[in-house]
């Protein structure tokens, strides 16, 4: 993890350039099964981290907000705390925390190291077992304190669920400002909770449908800079842009990276008005055609292992979801419900496909298994589109515009469909794309 490393409070091991230590004497008495349809949030006490200034309390607040937004945890109001933590290295008075039904306690401190580095220590305690579950410390640049908070939240999430978290990640999206008649659309990037917003393009050209590379440093997106939609690549840190396939005679759109990051899959418009799916090797710039039908084939998305591609096609008369091999062979229709389907995207876990559906005059965000079975609608509205998966495949982000609203906003929802959350953005927002974990 660039600019970060974590060290032990007990046993030292070197893994992937990170020095990691943790004490795990026992499993938490309450474990969260994220595969269950409805989960009762776990009451957890997140104390203010001790610090000379206010940074410790700010880190605690971000941790609490992350965990609460997941729908799996219920941070207890600090006003209910009986014990005031004065030394996070010493075990809490567990009986005091049992009184307020805190299943777990998070304590910590934040200090400034020589050279200006920030040091954050935290411990997670099992209240009813009376034991420490994990203890870690992190060093970072002072400006990266929010990332430290997200990583701690990920650690707590994993301790309870047995799965990686998703808080240390970013969202690239289309920022929309101005009136409907003079709407300015620019690419922007932010943390998954809406913090650290930064514009990536200047808004002089309409942009659509960004998507992250697996390495997280590059984005593919669609721009109308030349008067018609074309696929571009953008380096996030440098701002360098590149037109993909500048010899394409017609429009290109709906682009995504393959799981390795060395190819882009996209749709190219034919002169007869139909579109087919192509791949481009980013090293050789050679293209390969995957579909060849008199239909509109679009919105391709790779399976996590790179062996399959899901896409939409109206070859059967109306837009439906199909799955084919990565070389274009053996296309099979998997959606058979009422309405039309679009924007399928494979879960990073490989078990589900998210999609947008239009049925009964409304838009819907839904999921189905990779063979088309088990279709389930998570959210319905006047206009909701653009599903994108969290890195752990447990949450979906999308954009919603209600009837009469001046513009769209971003929302997230878990796979139960019961935890829909507004994602704060400075302006209207659409077309979100979730990054892999940064850590």
Curated annotation (Swiss-Prot):
Described purpose of this protein according to its UniProt entry: Part of the Tol-Pal system, which plays a role in outer membrane invagination during cell division and is important for maintaining outer membrane integrity.
Subunit structure: The Tol-Pal system is composed of five core proteins: the inner membrane proteins TolA, TolQ and TolR, the periplasmic protein TolB and the outer membrane protein Pal. They form a network linking the inner and outer membranes and the peptidoglycan layer.
Signal peptide (residue range): 1-22
Superkingdom field: Bacteria
Example GO BP: protein import
Location of the protein in the cell: Periplasm
Protein name in the entry: Tol-Pal system protein TolB
Family: Belongs to the TolB family.
Organism, as annotated: Chelativorans sp. (strain BNC1)
Keywords: Cell cycle, Cell division, Periplasm, Signal
UniProt GO cellular component terms: periplasmic space
